[in-house]
Amino acid sequence: MDQLEMKKLAAQAALEYVKADTIVGVGSGSTVNCFIEALGTIKNKIQGAVAASKASEELLRKQGIEVFNANDVSSLDIYVDGADEINPQKMMIKGGGAALTREKIVAALAKKFICIVDSSKQVDVLGSTFPLPVEVIPMARSQVGRKLVALGGAPEYREGVVTDNGNVILDVHNFSILNPVEMEKELNNVAGVATNGIFALRGADVVIVGTPEGAKIID
């Protein structure tokens, strides 16, 4: 079974958490794209969705699902998103698709965060296999880069990428994130940082892992 098939298994299993007549929070990325396709099969059951990226908005509309603005929603029943890495405490690194700030905003609206991944995304320590994305206001790029170096990281400017918010991304290598909560707070306090890709303060509540044996649920 290939990686795409495992992503589809996890995405399909997430439909079990979708309640009738609710607005669903939707993240971004390849696994979420599988979820949006699956959501299209039950679109008449839900009111619509709030999306964390313009790309996800477009896919939702193609499926005939109404897209709501986050400002018009006081809370969401669930938020479904993928991850670049996830640890046993259900904390994540996200932001490979450069939508991390909006993902945090939509996740914060949700009562329950459902993370859907394939088994390759599971790690013991965050930062093991994937650099940490940091979204930065453009005028602060060099300044933030120096701060990240001082913290022991090796930031790399993600060429040609502008986020939906008009910001840039620094991918930070060499971070072994042993205390995700504290590092998330520390990096978010750096002047010029919009947010960083550690999702520890608001981690996942349920993890659905697509494996060759089927969807495995960790709650």
UniProtKB/Swiss-Prot annotation:
This is Ribose-5-phosphate isomerase A. The active site is at E103 (proton acceptor). One of its GO terms (cellular component) is cytosol. GO terms for molecular function: ribose-5-phosphate isomerase activity. InterPro entries: NagB/RpiA_transferase-like, Ribose5P_isomerase_typA_subgr, Ribose5P_isomerase_type_A. Substrate binds at S28, G29, S30, T31, D81, G82, A83, D84, K94, G95, G96, G97, K121. Catalyzes the reversible conversion of ribose-5-phosphate to ribulose 5-phosphate. Its EC number is 5.3.1.6. It catalyses: aldehydo-D-ribose 5-phosphate = D-ribulose 5-phosphate. Pathway: Carbohydrate degradation; pentose phosphate pathway; D-ribose 5-phosphate from D-ribulose 5-phosphate (non-oxidative stage): step 1/1. Belongs to the ribose 5-phosphate isomerase family. Homodimer.
